[in-house]
Amino acid sequence: MFELPKLVKALELSIKSHPALLTKFSFDEDGEIVQTYDPSLMSEITVEKISEFDLNILKDNLVQPFKMIDSRLFRCRVFETEKSAYMFFDVHHTVFDGTSFKVLMKDIAQSYMGMPVPQDYYYLTLKKRENAAHTAFYEESRKYFEERYDGDDWISFPPVDHKTRENEFGQLACEMGVTSAELGIIEKRFKVSRNEFFITVAALAVSFFEGKPKVKLSWIYNGREDLKMMNTVGLLYRDLPVAFCFDKNQNIADIFADVHEQVQKAIEHSCYPYVENNSLVVEGDVASVLYQRDIRDAGDLDGMKIETVDIRQNNAASQSVLDIEILDSDLGLRLSLDYASSRYERSTMERFRELFLRITAVLVHADGAEYLTVKGLRDELQKNHSFFRKVMSVFSKRKRN
């Protein structure tokens, strides 16, 4: 039987175990923003009894903007209805990332079952990163990135419909027509990781969409360099660059080999924040690619399956011009395009989404895809609209079954 008081205690212990969640931002004497650990930010979590009807109304007003200075940057509430128990957790991205969610959920489950929560090394990690900035390797990494990726003739996202500094949020999400098992075959065929595969698909889509060969994107590396950091909650991921200069006679397999090398070198030199130092809103935006396990697959708690409930984000802002997220789950893969709706018409993003899906479908399902050139891939896309529709139709039937 599920014990709600026991869950509340597990929640409180897990939150207290992660310093990033009890961190606040403030200004120092020089007017610089600093972050400080403040355990007094933790408040007691209580069980709130409410009806399913009232909770259904309340849930879409739970997510609201945070006060950023001298304030707690997470919210946690527990609700009990006549039907279920619900945990609401909202946290600002400045102290939390996708890996952090997995760590927190694992710790809640372990604490609920009476197991100890591993040590969190958040502030030690920040100190190590500060110290790294004063090393010779940091300077070597800066030179590596600048020599490899500097220049102003790259395209880094599909052409926008409107030029503005307004930052409204839009999203398109859909099933991809690809299973995790099929991706396993792709990894062996092209000798790339799933992350590298989708980075390449994204770059090809941007290039074909605008008709230009030189593309520079960023991709998300979780930033956890050792086992200790794998238990650490915080905004620790790194945005790393990757670039392409497509030629019509270039073999797709050779492109994948180059991407694999770039990804490995970028991780090696990830102590230098090249993308963060060079990306400016509007003038220096770079589309970002993220492949990850779908965080909505929350797993179970002491043998009881956890279900996630989507709720509305109020006053949401776009984090970048375009985030291309591929979410992998047991049910298949989902594509999510998070974009600046103040700069893109929805119809533009719908056309880009279809192109991304078609490139994926050809590379995954077409016979001899590993022998295609860039021109051959483009030809397949132009003549094979029916193939794409057939693949998506078959996948939809498979999902229903």
Task: Describe the role of every protein-language-model region.
Residues 79-123, 349-364:
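Active-site-proximal acidic secondary-structure segment that organizes catalysis
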Residues 1, 28-50, 61, 70-75, ...:
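Acyl/amide activation-and-transfer machinery of modular secondary-metabolite enzymes
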Residues 37, 264, 292-299, 346-401:
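Flexible, non-catalytic linker and terminal segments flanking ANL/adenylate-forming cores
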Residues 8-53, 72, 121-170, 384-401:
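Short amphipathic alpha-helices and their capping loops
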Residues 18, 22, 105-106, 213-220, ...:
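Extended, hydrophobic beta-loop-alpha segments that form or line the acyl/peptidyl-thioester binding
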Residues 53-58, 101-102, 139, 167-185, ...:
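AMP-binding/adenylate-forming domain of the ANL superfamily
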Residues 1, 8, 19-21, 27, ...:
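His-Asp-centered acyl/peptidyl-transfer active-site segments
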